[in-house]
């Protein structure tokens, strides 16, 4: 067995006296891919920030050895010089710069006199992409011209340009399509063959099983186990992550489906940058009280834009006819939608769901502050009572209600956003990718909440790129393709193949909506 490239022993990191890491061990060998698994808040990101120098030596206890010698990094530059490079879940690219400029950002090739040698950077960037067998990216084009999948590949090329010996991938496929994920996994396998080690952090355990040689599981800041992937099953990994078995991920509860509460007709949205292009093209559907409607489709199909249009949040030109309980609505903003009884948990919680500068509690009450106002002042005691009640009801885990929401795990941030929207007492709740970047334990909690809301008569629209999630939750499934409604199916014996078939059909061949959506 080869000598370890990296050894972390007894890593302890505390914040305000509370241990986020409590004696964590991690070993990685050259050419090995180690899966790092744990629930949101388990300490995975904190451990990687220790390793990558975000938390410098001296701010944590324990030992890190790199290539057999102690590593005492004072910052990220030190670890990158050593060959440790992290690719964060939120990509660190500058959209306006070219692909080549991003690959060399902070590591530019210069000419005598200090001017940048753009020709050399373009040539080397092209070489790096060829090494990764990527031929679909023009290095002279701005990064903004490429989607999330290509941007992830650009980040990998950027890491290799820093001569990475250990590549840390933090939820690398969270915004990728299935085909883009396959390309990513092929690249990870190729890097392993070249001797590059990887730490692969993901809640998608099928990906962990596909590329990882060993798996390290941490829970509540402690090391649980490190075992060869060949000896593990996904159920076993989940049990180690959460400390219990999750037997029924989709606990379908009987719920009565009533009359139509929301009716949407002829939604059409124009592209923000090209008004001749339609992002949503004449979509009509309805949702009944207590019904869970899943919305499926390929990335870029227009699902999010459709939901934004209903919620009054679409940034471009949009036309639609919307009625609630038979009464016409005029929705020009999210505030109008909330007043009408429509709430939405957005796809990108960090940009549109939370205010990172505020605490957890103030994020939760943000949409209903008027409820606590009296004579121009906020009743802080009443607000705090509500915050504590909602945090307990949705199991939002935070040391105290005023802790910065930015410091919480993705799962706890998502539950805080849900709490905020539920305080508006909606009749219709739109959930756009509600479990993206959320661990399996938090997923189960969110699913239970969805079924509980349906039992209370709330109409739910759940947009998801995960077809098992759509099939596990929905009473009915809408399929969107190229901005059009390609299918409307009752979820009885429905398969993933049927959904994908509808999504991929050319518009003129797409099936007409079934009677499932008839009012």
Swiss-Prot record:
Mode of membrane association:
Peripheral membrane protein
The keyword Metal-binding appears for this protein = no
InterPro entries, alphabetized = AAA+_ATPase, ABC_carbohydrate_import_ATPase, ABC_transporter-like_ATP-bd, ABC_transporter-like_CS, ABC_transptr_XylG, P-loop_NTPase
> What does UniProt give as GO cellular component?
plasma membrane
Q: What class of enzyme is it?
A: translocase
Recorded GO terms, molecular function?
Answer: ABC-type D-xylose transporter activity; ATP binding; ATP hydrolysis activity
Q: Tell me the keywords, alphabetical order.
A: ATP-binding, Cell inner membrane, Cell membrane, Membrane, Nucleotide-binding, Repeat, Sugar transport, Translocase, Transport
Recorded hits in SMART domains, A to Z, give:
AAA
**Can you state which reaction this protein catalyses?**
D-xylose(out) + ATP + H2O = D-xylose(in) + ADP + phosphate + H(+)
Query: Where mainly found?
Result: membrane
Subunit (UniProt): The complex is composed of two ATP-binding proteins (XylG), two transmembrane proteins (XylH) and a solute-binding protein (XylF).
Function per UniProt: Part of the ABC transporter complex XylFGH involved in xylose import. Responsible for energy coupling to the transport system.
- Which protein family is it in? Belongs to the ABC transporter superfamily. Xylose importer (TC 3.A.1.2.4) family.
Which PANTHER family does this chain map to?
CARBOHYDRATE TRANSPORT ATP-BINDING PROTEIN MG119-RELATED, XYLOSE IMPORT ATP-BINDING PROTEIN XYLG
By what name is this protein known? Xylose import ATP-binding protein XylG
Write down the species.
Burkholderia cenocepacia (strain HI2424)
């Amino acid at each position: 067995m080869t000598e370890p490239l990296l050894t972390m022993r007894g890593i302890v990191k505390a914040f305000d006296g509370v241990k986020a890491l409590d004696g964590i061990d991690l070993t990685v060998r050259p050419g090995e891919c180690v899966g790092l698994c744990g629930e949101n808040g388990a300490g995975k990101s904190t451990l990687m920030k220790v390793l990558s120098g975000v938390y410098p030596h001296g701010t944590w206890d324990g030992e890190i050895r790199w290539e057999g010698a102690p590593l005492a990094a004072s910052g990220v530059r030190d670890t990158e010089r050593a060959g440790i490079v992290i690719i964060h879940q939120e990509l660190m690219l500058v959209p306006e710069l070219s692909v080549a400029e991003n690959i060399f950002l902070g590591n530019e090739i210069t000419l005598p006199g200090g001017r940048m040698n753009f020709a050399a950077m373009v040539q080397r960037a092209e070489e790096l992409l060829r090494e990764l067998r990527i031929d679909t990216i023009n290095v002279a084009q701005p990064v903004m011209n490429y989607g999330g999948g290509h941007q992830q590949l650009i980040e990998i090329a950027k890491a290799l340009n820093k001569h990475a010996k250990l590549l840390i991938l933090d939820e690398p496929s969270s915004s990728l399509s299935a085909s883009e994920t396959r390309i990513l996994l092929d690249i990870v396998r190729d890097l392993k063959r070249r001797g590059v080690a990887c730490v692969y952090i993901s809640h998608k355990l099928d990906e962990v099983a596909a590329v990882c040689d060993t798996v390290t599981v941490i829970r509540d800041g402690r090391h649980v186990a490190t075992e060869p992937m060949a000896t593990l099953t996904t159920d076993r990994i989940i049990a180690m992550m959460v400390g219990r078995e999750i037997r029924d991920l989709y606990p379908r509860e009987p719920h009565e489906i009533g009359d139509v509460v929301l009716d949407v007709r002829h939604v059409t949205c124009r592209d923000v940058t090209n008004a001749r292009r339609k992002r949503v093209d004449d979509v009509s559907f309805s949702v009944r009280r207590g019904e869970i409607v899943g919305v499926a489709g390929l990335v870029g199909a227009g699902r999010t834009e459709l939901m934004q249009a209903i919620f009054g949040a679409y940034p471009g030109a949009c036309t639609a006819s919307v009625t609630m309980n038979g009464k016409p609505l005029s929705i020009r903003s999210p505030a109008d939608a909330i007043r009408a009884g429509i709430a939405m948990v957005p796809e990108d919680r960090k940009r549109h769901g939370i205010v990172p500068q505020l605490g957890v509690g103030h994020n939760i009450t943000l949409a209903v502050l008027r409820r606590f106002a009296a004579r121009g002042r906020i009743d802080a005691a009443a607000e705090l009572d509500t915050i504590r009640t909602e945090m307990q009801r949705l199991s939002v885990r935070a040391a105290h209600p005023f802790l910065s929401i930015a410091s919480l795990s993705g799962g706890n941030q998502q539950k805080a956003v849900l709490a905020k929207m539920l305080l508006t007492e909606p009749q219709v709740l739109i959930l756009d990718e509600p479990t993206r970047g959320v661990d399996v334990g938090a997923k189960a909690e969110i699913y239970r909440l969805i079924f509980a809301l349906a039992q209370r008569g709330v109409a739910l629209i759940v947009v998801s790129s995960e077809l098992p999630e759509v099939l596990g939750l929905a009473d009915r499934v809408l399929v969107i393709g190229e901005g059009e409604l390609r299918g409307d199916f009752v979820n009885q014996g429905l398969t993933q193949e049927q959904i994908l078939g509808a999504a991929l059909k050319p518009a003129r061949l797409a099936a007409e909506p079934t009677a499932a959506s008839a009012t």
